[in-house]
Amino acid sequence: MRLLIAGGGTGGHLFPGIAVAEEFLSRKKGNEVLFVGTWRGIEARVLPKLGYRLECITAAGIRGKGSVARAKGLAKFLYGYAQSRKILKEFKPDLVLGVGGYASAPALLAARGMHIPRFIHEQNAIPGFTNKMLATVAERVFISLEESRKFFPEERTLLTGNPLRRQILEQVALAPQEERTDDAFHLLVFGGSAGAHRINLIMGEVLPHLEDVKERLRITHQTGENDLEDVTSAYEEQGVAADVVAFIDSMADAYRWADLVVCRAGATTIAEITACGKPCIFIPYPHAVDDHQRRNAEALLKRGAGFVIIEQELSGEVLAKTIRDLMADPARLKSVGEAAQGLARLDAAQVIVDEMMTSKRKEK
């Protein structure tokens, strides 16, 4: 069988698609996967390195833009639609999955016109414009969080969770945390592959408020390239043991090491946090479309599976107090981690592939 996965732009859209691709290829020798994305998206850098085929089309957003920009966006969409039809005719997929992002719309709509079974996956609590529109033409809508169900047709919507790459599933979700005999407290801080400038800055303000517990603290902080030197200097000046890096090669190892995580609330991050059963202080990115990161984090908060500090209320003192309180309450840390793990859907990729294949068999 052949599967075409359309979308990307960000890791939050792309990585669930990669997880589904891994599962689909593992089912039967001879299965094939083709990704469709754009040259501007993260897929253009990531997929070739992983050995996946990628076709790039022209696509752009039109939401919330002026009339001239909308006209240009529409022209790009029509061109991308024509490109998608050509790709579909050449690849001849049995199934098409949209994972969100600009490229998913022309590809899914072209698949509809060619009567190819099509599906979408929504990663966030608040769906993006593209997926809300594509839900009208998709045979199945797969969702990561129960909160997004109300935006889609009930009879065609299935809660699957957010698919995770096998690296995470194998190295973290299935591996026990190392036993430690010392009193060290491991804090993992990160903000995605590019870092998060606000989180990087705030940690410098946090440290003076943790002076009396800094001997216990062991921090791994992923900053991205831009803030690496400044953050490194901040930890050195405060005398706090910290491993400050631009990138973390193995998030699986980092999660396993951590007692507490401080990070943004992107969909993939939340899926990884829950799979690992890690207590986390989420600081949602305030400029995400439809404020979806805050909604993602609140979905865990209301289930006792995480902590949330919105940026408008963020200060060094507030974050330090939250960290200090949790350092002093291992039972609470444990219960929140267990609640997070209770929300994990480790079989998300399997369920999605099963559903797509079942739909294809019914078609026959």
Curated annotation (Swiss-Prot):
Keywords: Cell cycle, Cell division, Cell inner membrane, Cell membrane, Cell shape, Cell wall biogenesis/degradation, Glycosyltransferase, Membrane, Peptidoglycan synthesis, Transferase. It catalyses: di-trans,octa-cis-undecaprenyl diphospho-N-acetyl-alpha-D-muramoyl-L-alanyl-D-glutamyl-meso-2,6-diaminopimeloyl-D-alanyl-D-alanine + UDP-N-acetyl-alpha-D-glucosamine = di-trans,octa-cis-undecaprenyl diphospho-[N-acetyl-alpha-D-glucosaminyl-(1->4)]-N-acetyl-alpha-D-muramoyl-L-alanyl-D-glutamyl-meso-2,6-diaminopimeloyl-D-alanyl-D-alanine + UDP + H(+). It is a peripheral membrane protein. Its main location: membrane. The keyword Glycosyltransferase applies. Its EC number is 2.4.1.227. One of its GO terms (cellular component) is plasma membrane. NCBIfam families: murG (TIGR01133). Belongs to the glycosyltransferase 28 family. MurG subfamily. This is UDP-N-acetylglucosamine--N-acetylmuramyl-(pentapeptide) pyrophosphoryl-undecaprenol N-acetylglucosamine transferase. It comes from Geobacter metallireducens (strain ATCC 53774 / DSM 7210 / GS-15).
